[in-house]
A protein has these predicted regions:
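Conserved N-terminal glycine-rich FAD pyrophosphate-binding loop of Rossmann-like flavoproteins
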Residues: 1-27, 228-230
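Conserved FAD-binding subdomain of flavin-dependent enzymes
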Residues: 15-63, 203-210
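Mobile, glycine/GP-rich and aromatic-enriched active-site lid/loop segments adjacent to catalytic centers
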Residues: 59-144, 210-413, 495-614
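Core beta-strand elements of the Rossmann-like FAD/NAD(P) dinucleotide-binding domain
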Residues: 153-163
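Short, well-ordered coil/turn residues at beta-beta hairpins
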Residues: 161-163, 167-168, 405-406
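Glycine-rich loop(s) and the adjacent beta-strand/alpha-helix scaffold that form part
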Residues: 166-225, 417-430
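Catalytic phosphate/nucleotide-handling subdomain of diverse soluble enzymes
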Residues: 391-460
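Long, amphipathic alpha-helical stalk/connector segments used for oligomerization, subunit docking
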Residues: 436-531
Length: 614
């Protein structure tokens, strides 16, 4: 799927370097995600991620450097001015403790070129939309293949495989977006991420984790432009309409959520929590104070450096969010003269940014992770699932042969592009080992090819059978268009499952209504039509979104607390309950009965978290 790196990036947000170590990284990840993450996964990513960044630079990604005299130069200049590669001891330009600046408008192309050379184009099939994983006929709890279709020609692909890497991104557009009408389709995360990772894994029998988690980024309003460089590199502050820095004005609120609000950098959701107070009490709109930030930088820079800095302010968007430049140009905004509005977005589900929903995977075996399940509700964990945090292959789900990385790996956020790539490398090596260990296994699909093709094309048949009933093909009592079905899903989630309509608030009664409406939506979804390949794509994206949305709702329903204030609030349990809910909420889906089983798994710290507060 075209993903988070496709439009480019202006920074790599996870690079450990010599200043920190993987344990520091695991601490940061844990605190930002309110204490419920797997240290084994974060630590493992932390000790491998720099290798991925070094590979990116070797393949041609321009990374900014700080020269020996302290001068900062971008990726185009340093090779001619005495700079070094990172692997040779070069010093990156850090915008924050973990982030390094890049010229990344071609980031994905550069990494993809390396993949093409390694694999060979003869072994790559593009524009094939995978809709379903297929379990094995003879070996229980094992994946053996997948089915998909070309979005360019009338062709279905059925694969068999011993090992499969499922990395189709996170989930966007299950909530009604802030950008509607002519802005439809503009989102912060890529709209092509349709929850396929989570739905296909769940239908294959994989255990999900922390699906209640979501990310609600505060971004430049309407364009969803990135704020990281402004906060970290340009040292800008966010204010209310009266110029007050809301993080200062409301800082006492952070003490309501110890210890996560008391770290040097409070958890992301809590920063939203403070912003939402301003909005609810009528002190909006919120602004990024670009004018003051650039004015302060001018005091210490030469006119030439100032001009370069202003260019970088624009390039920050051109590198990764061109639409935000359109907003600035269209609204006559010059950042040195006029501040820009900020706004928290609609919710997104992901496992690689400041979010940690995803799939429960096997971790490393050498960092002291639990190998058994010991807590008061351990008997409620389904008996067929493995105990502990590792069961043989790094990155493998609870389904044999099914691996994931990036947004797919739950309980370990803040991987971003580099960490996701590192997880992919770890999973790929484990997949090779799995295939070697299972060399005598011959995968056999548990569903016939004819049945798979029939299910895949059902929306097309629905259209062909009923299209002549009415004179307007979009208005027909026998089917619904994918576009309209998506609007229904977004309305349900927005109004009942803590979307922007309710300031991210929900309760048990609202979710009971959502549950009922989602059941009816699933019935209606069987009548989706597809008049062409594009609508067939949209129809299957909707099937994936609906099940992912249901998982999200079921997990919030089960977790009787508000673990992520600022991202969502349960008004009937509006607290962070460390005594009863400092745990993972996990689930499995039975594709035959269509029922979810949701349960707790114990949390355990593997690194000392107190260092954050010393």
């Amino acid at each position: 799927r075209s993903g988070a790196v496709a439009q480019g990036l202006s920074a790599i947000n996870t690079y450990i370097g010599n200043e920190q170590d993987p344990a520091d990284y695991a601490r940061m990840v844990s605190n930002d995600l309110m204490g419920i993450t797997r240290d084994d996964l974060a630590y493992d990513t932390g000790r491998h991620v720099d290798d991925s960044v070094h590979l990116f630079e070797e393949w041609g990604l321009p990374i900014w450097k700080t020269l020996a005299d302290g001068t900062r130069v971008d990726g185009a200049r340093w090779p001619n001015e005495g700079g070094k590669l990172l692997v040779e001891g070069g010093t990156p330009v850090r915008s924050g403790k973990w982030q390094i600046m890049i010229n990344g408008e071609s980031y994905k192309w550069i990494v993809a070129e390396a993949a093409k050379k390694a694999i060979g184009m003869d072994n790559i099939q593009e524009r094939v939309f995978i809709v379903k994983l297929v379990n094995d006929k003879n070996k229980e709890n094992t994946v053996s293949g997948a089915v998909g279709f070309s979005v360019r020609e009338d062709q279905v692909y059925v694969y068999t495989a011993k090992a499969i890497l499922l990395v189709a991104g996170g989930c966007v557009n299950i909530f009604r977006p802030r950008s509607v009408g002519e802005g439809q389709g503009r989102a912060w995360y890529p709209v092509w991420n349709a929850g396929s990772t989570y739905t296909m894994a769940a239908e294959a029998g994989a255990e999900l984790t922390l699906m209640e988690n979501r990310f609600v980024p505060a971004r430049f309003k309407d364009g969803y432009g990135p704020v990281g460089a402004w906060f970290l590199l340009f040292k800008a502050t966010a204010t209310n309409a009266f110029g007050e820095v809301y993080m200062d004005r409301n800082k006492e609120m952070l003490n309501d959520y110890p210890p996560y609000g008391q770290a040097a950098v409070p958890a992301s959701c809590l920063r939203n929590h403070l912003m939402l107070k301003e909005m609810k009490e009528g002190r909006g709109p919120m602004y990024m104070d670009t004018v003051t930030a650039l004015a302060n930088l001018r005091k210490t820079l030469t006119p030439k450096e100032v001009k370069h800095l202003e260019a970088e302010a624009w390039e920050d968007f051109l590198d990764m969010c061109v639409g935000q430049c359109g907003i600035w140009v269209g609204e006559n905004i010059e950042p040195e003269k006029k501040n820009s509005e900020l706004m928290p977005t609609e919710p997104y589900l992901l496992g690689s940014h400041s979010g940690c929903c995803g799939i429960w995977v096997s971790g490393p075996t050498d960092v002291g992770a639990p190998t058994s399940e010991e807590h008061a509700e351990a008997d409620k964990v389904p008996s067929h699932l493995p105990s502990g945090w590792n069961w043989g292959y790094r990155g493998m789900t609870t389904v044999n042969g099914l691996f994931t990385a990036g947004d797919g790996v739950g309980a370990s956020g803040h991987k971003f592009s580099s960490g996701s790539h590192a997880e992919g490398r770890l999973a790929a090596k484990a997949m090779v080992q799995y295939c070697i260990d299972n060399k005598d296994f011959t995968p056999e699909l548990d569903t016939s090819v004819d049945d798979l093709v029939s299910e895949l094309y059902q929306p097309v048949r629905t259209y062909l059978e009923h299209k002549d009933y009415s004179t307007a093909i979009d208005v027909n009592p026998n089917y619904i268009t994918p576009r309209m079905l998506q609007f229904r899903l977004q309305k349900i989630m927005d109004e009942y499952v803590a979307g922007v309509a309710t300031y991210y608030q929900t309760n048990a009664q609202m979710m009971a209504v959502a549950e009922e409406k989602l059941e009816m939506l699933k019935e209606d979804a069987k009548k989706m039509r597809a008049k062409d390949l594009h609508e067939l794509l949209r129809a299957w994206e909707n099937y994936h979104r609906i099940l992912t949305a249901e998982a999200h709702m079921k997990h919030i329903q089960f977790r009787e607390e508000s673990r992520y204030p600022g991202f969502y609030y349960r008004t009937d349990y509006n607290l962070v309950d460390e005594e009863n809910w400092h745990c993972f909420v996990n689930s499995v889906y039975d594709k035959n009965t269509k029922e979810w089983t949701v349960f707790k798994r114990a949390h355990k710290d593997l690194v000392d978290k107190s260092k954050l507060f010393k």
